[in-house]
UniProtKB/Swiss-Prot annotation:
GO molecular function: DNA binding
GO cellular component terms, A-Z: cytoplasm
Location(s) in or outside the cell: Cytoplasm
Pfam family, one: TraY
Gene field: traY
Subunit and interaction comment: Part of the relaxosome, a complex composed of plasmid encoded TraI, TraM, TraY and host-encoded IHF bound to the F plasmid origin of transfer (oriT). Interacts with TraM, probably through its C-terminus.
Major place of residence: cytoplasm
Family assignment from sequence similarity: Belongs to the TraY family.
Protein name: Relaxosome protein TraY
Keywords in alphabetical order: Activator, Conjugation, Cytoplasm, DNA-binding, Plasmid, Transcription, Transcription regulation
Signal peptide extent: none
Function: Conjugative DNA transfer (CDT) is the unidirectional transfer of ssDNA plasmid from a donor to a recipient cell. It is the central mechanism by which antibiotic resistance and virulence factors are propagated in bacterial populations. Part of the relaxosome, which facilitates a site- and strand-specific cut in the origin of transfer by TraI, at the nic site. Relaxosome formation requires binding of IHF and TraY to the oriT region, which then facilitates binding of TraI. Also positively regulates tra gene expression.
Amino acid sequence: MRRRNARGGISRTVSVYLDEDTNNRLIKAKDRSGRSKTIEVQIRLRDHLKRFPDFYNEEIFREVTEESESTFKEL
């Protein structure tokens, strides 16, 4: 189901499973900010993606070659 969001675009729903510690931290953060849990997640996820747009960059990954199926570098 598509819904319009406050920013004027179409929004998508994403479900996640959180461990107890992460959930408790999120609840404390939303209580401090006065926002809903959903809005707190949206803001924090958007911020993370802006600050770390290339989280998996070429320093960590390399292109798959014909000889290898692995995309991870040996660390």
